[in-house]
Regions:
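Glycine-rich phosphate-binding loop signature in dinucleotide/nucleotide-binding domains
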Residues: 1, 96-99, 148-152
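N-terminal helical cap/lid subdomain that shapes the substrate entry/recognition surface
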Residues: 2-89, 97, 108
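Surface-exposed amphipathic alpha-helices with a cationic face
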Residues: 88-96, 146, 168
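Generic structural signal for small/hydrophobic residues in well-ordered secondary structure
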Residues: 8-11, 50, 103, 126, ...
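Hydrophobic residues in well-ordered beta-strands that form the structural core
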Residues: 15, 103-105, 176
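Asp-based, Mg2+/Mn2+-dependent phosphohydrolase catalytic module
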Residues: 108, 113-196
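Generic enzyme active-site microenvironment
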Residues: 6, 104, 156-157
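Non-catalytic pre-domain segments flanking phosphatase-related domains
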Residues: 1-7, 153, 196
Length: 196
């Protein structure tokens, strides 16, 4: 049976760290991100699933009279993120060797617009939370992915353990992506080991 390797975008294919955004939010609000973190996290899935836009998100998190730039998420993403071209080339080599590759990523509608989709044309599967109206780590997204892929042999690489833990419940193999493990060659080795 064909093996399928799915990759997250932000924090994996795209160099990204959530702390960059939290620092920008702290700077604009002139108060620690920790003060709004629970409300922020409680509403993030609605943003990822296109149930609300960035403006509505901030009105819910901070109230209607907030002072934050309501495009802070997409602006920070555009300003700070970059493509990991070395990893992207490695991923494309997996496809050249007969494997199927895909993307499973949480994106806001606004950050989705920041991504050069032509860079991702070679991917066989595209699962974007804002398009399919489901987000990680909610179980329904993994159920949906498994039903869309005609293989029971799926590997998922993500930078958040909670997303991987949920994937494991659907018999998806997982690898936690960290920059150190990538720089040392461990991520590519684990993927190669999975394929052999």
């Amino acid at each position: 049976m064909e093996k399928v390797i799915l990759f997250d975008l932000g924090g994996v294919i795209i160099n990204w760290n959530d702390d960059w955004l939290y620092d920008e939010i702290t700077s604009q609000l002139k108060q620690p991100f920790e003060k709004i973190k629970s409300k922020y996290n409680a509403n993030l899935c609605s943003l990822f699933e296109s149930k609300i836009n960035e403006n509505q998100f901030w009105n819910i998190v901070l109230g209607d009279d907030n002072i934050i730039d309501d495009k802070i998420i997409s602006k920070t993403f555009l300003k700070k993120s970059s493509i990991n071209y070395n990893l992207l080339n490695f991923i494309k080599s997996l496809k050249d060797n007969g494997n199927s590759i895909g993307i499973l990523s949480n994106l806001t509608p606004e950050t989705s617009d920041c991504i050069q989709k032509n860079l991702l044309d070679d991917f066989d599967y595209h699962f974007y939370s804002n398009s399919i109206k489901m987000s990680k780590p909610n179980p329904e997204i993994y159920d949906y992915v498994c039903k869309q892929i005609p293989s029971n042999d799926i590997l998922f690489i993500d930078d958040k353990q909670e997303n991987l833990d949920a994937a494991k419940l659907f018999n998806i193999e997982t690898i936690l992506f960290t920059p150190d493990d990538y720089d040392s060659g461990l991520i590519e080795k684990k993927i190669s080991d999975y394929l052999n």
